[in-house]
Amino acid sequence: MTDPGPAHDGRSRCPWADGSELYRDYHDREWGRPLRGSTALFERLTLEAFQSGLSWLIILRKRDNFRGAFAGFDIDTVAGFTDRDVARLMDDAGIVRNRAKIEAAITNARAVADLDVDLSDLLWSFAPPPRPRPAAIGDLPAQTPESRAMARELKRRGFRFVGPTTAYALMQATGMVDDHLADCWVPLNGR
């Protein structure tokens, strides 16, 4: 499928949002809308890293559990997690129990806490100029020069599990790029 498909409400959406009410709500209310704030962006960065190799629907279904397990993504709290917290998280069936991803989330919280700039300012500094919306799903890149630069800078600053593809997914999810298809009903994000 390359064009937005109509949902039961008659609206034309990006095709990935079809098939699940949870996907549809995420698409309509969150995805591609500009998001700022260190805690909110740390949450999205963490969830995008946990999604790597999995369906985003799995992450959406577990998002509330992730919020509880990771103290509402409070950066200072997560940065203070210990081996005991890693063990607790590994026993939590409500989240994705992947030790490398859990440890990366803690490492990333520590990296955010050590930043000399606001996380929001750092991430948004890689947002490219607005461009026309793509006509079809096949027109969407998996990564861009900006996402590669973001991933490099985050790695330099001690972040883990944030490669250029994950960085681009973060850019899409948080409105740094507007990758809703041209025929999608969601208004331009106007960032």
Where are these regions (language model features)?
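HhH-family (HhH-GPD) DNA N-glycosylase catalytic core used in base-excision repair
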Residues: 1-191
